[in-house]
């Protein structure tokens, strides 16, 4: 074969791939579409459309949709993208609970499992967890497509290569590797910071998000960044982890061993008085009790300072989630935004601060998206 023939063959293959990707992308974004509509929208020949539809349906990537009315009187077959032809599983491990969530390629949960399983850094725990994951995955594959992999959302920090938990004081898993955690899991596996995983789901709930600082005000606060509509992790897999930014030099001790961290001041654990719970604090706050209002003001000031500091570097919108967010109403959020604005020299003309739409499954869903997002990118990424 001459060089010219090789070039022609390569060009034809690229064209075929582009046509296939264009059809997949159109069906995934427009729902049920007929061949005729694909022909009109994509400006492709009917034989090209028909051949691709046949191949994609054979591969399970698309499926027949409902019959639709046509001008000729005979109903036309429509086609749709099949988001469950591949699946992925996300896992969260906390002190007493193991949570699994399987998602399709569009990030929708297709099955969940929550089990009481007290964490222990032992092979017995990891093997028991692995057995639960393998059984769960087998059930998913019976009803849907193959599982691409299993991703673990970890509170704390992970190594730059994504294989080791480098800090986790909530379960004591610091230093544990992915090989230990997933020692009996029969699928590809990954680690991700839980805050980063939850942030990934923010883009599912709000497709308009472009740049955002995600701040999760749990008892152990954490953060993550969304840039250009996607999670931004950076080369060290810790971008957005603002919880250990120094807020007050030489201030309160933090659980990381340093002093003055944002986490030490912005945790909702700072709100209750002795022997009072966090829900109890907000219940009394609603009644207008003076000392509770003072504590709330101090806490909001510290949260606002943390946000204003971060926005000096990344002038983005802000999403507030976590346990504390469950008790914050519209007035609290508006108040917090005013405090941030008052602390900011510039960058508040176009600035939105809102509550997260995450829920108890968001960490697992976002973790699973580590497998589904790259698969979808490869499925319809334009050729270069």
Which residues does each predicted region cover?
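Glycine-rich phosphate-binding/hydrolytic loop that grips phosphoryl groups
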Residues: 5, 12, 17, 25-28, ...
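Gly/Thr-rich phosphate-binding beta-strand-loop-beta motif of the actin/hexokinase/Hsp70
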Residues: 73-112, 214-227
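Nucleotide/phosphate-binding catalytic cleft detector across ATP-hydrolyzing
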Residues: 1-75, 79, 379-384
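Glycine/GP-enriched mid-protein hinge/lid loop-to-helix segment characteristic of carbohydrate kinases
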Residues: 112-114, 121, 183-291
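Conserved phosphate-binding catalytic cores of ATP/NTP-utilizing and phosphoryl-transfer enzymes
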Residues: 64-88, 193-214
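Adenine-nucleotide phosphate-binding core of ATP-dependent small-molecule kinases
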Residues: 124-141, 265, 270-329, 355-356, ...
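Glycine-rich phosphate-binding loop and adjoining helix at the ATP-binding site
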Residues: 109, 113-211, 329-342
């Amino acid at each position: 074969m001459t060089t010219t023939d090789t070039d022609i063959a390569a060009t034809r293959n690229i064209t075929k791939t582009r046509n296939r990707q264009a059809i997949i992308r159109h069906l995934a974004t427009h729902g049920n579409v007929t061949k005729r509509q694909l022909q009109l929208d994509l400006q492709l020949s009917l034989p090209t459309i028909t051949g691709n539809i046949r191949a994609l349906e054979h591969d399970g990537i698309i499926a027949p949709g409902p019959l639709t009315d046509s001008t000729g009187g005979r109903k036309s077959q429509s086609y749709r993208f099949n988001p469950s032809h591949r699946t992925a599983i996300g896992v969260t491990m906390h002190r007493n609970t193991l949570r699994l969530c399987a998602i399709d390629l569009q990030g929708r949960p297709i099955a969940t499992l929550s089990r009481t399983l007290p964490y222990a850094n032992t092979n017995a725990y990891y093997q028991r967890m692995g057995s639960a994951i393998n059984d769960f995955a087998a059930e998913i594959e019976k009803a849907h497509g193959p599982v691409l992999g299993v991703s673990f959302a970890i509170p704390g920090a992970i190594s730059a290569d994504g294989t080791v938990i480098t800090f986790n004081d909530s379960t004591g898993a610091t230093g544990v590797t992915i090989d230990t955690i997933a020692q009996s899991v029969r699928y590809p596996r990954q680690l991700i910071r839980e805050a980063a995983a939850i942030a990934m789901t923010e883009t599912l709930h709000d497709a308009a998000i472009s740049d955002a600082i995600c701040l999760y005000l749990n008892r152990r606060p954490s953060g993550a960044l969304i840039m250009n509509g996607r999670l931004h992790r950076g080369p060290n897999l810790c971008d957005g982890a603002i919880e250990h930014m120094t807020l007050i030099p030489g201030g309160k001790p933090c659980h990381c061993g340093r002093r003055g961290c944002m986490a030490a001041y912005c945790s909702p654990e700072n709100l209750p008085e002795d022997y009072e719970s966090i829900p109890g604090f907000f219940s009394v706050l609603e009644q207008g009790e003076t000392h509770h209002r003072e504590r709330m003001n101090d806490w909001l000031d510290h949260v606002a300072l943390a946000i204003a500091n971060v926005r000096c570097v990344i002038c983005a919108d802000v999403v507030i989630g976590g346990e504390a967010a469950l008790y914050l109403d519209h007035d609290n959020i508006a108040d917090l935004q005013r405090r941030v604005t008052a602390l900011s020299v510039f960058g508040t003309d176009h600035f939105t601060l809102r509550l997260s739409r995450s829920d108890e499954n968001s960490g697992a869903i976002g973790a699973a998206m580590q497998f589904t997002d790259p698969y979808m990118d490869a499925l319809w990424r334009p050729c270069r």
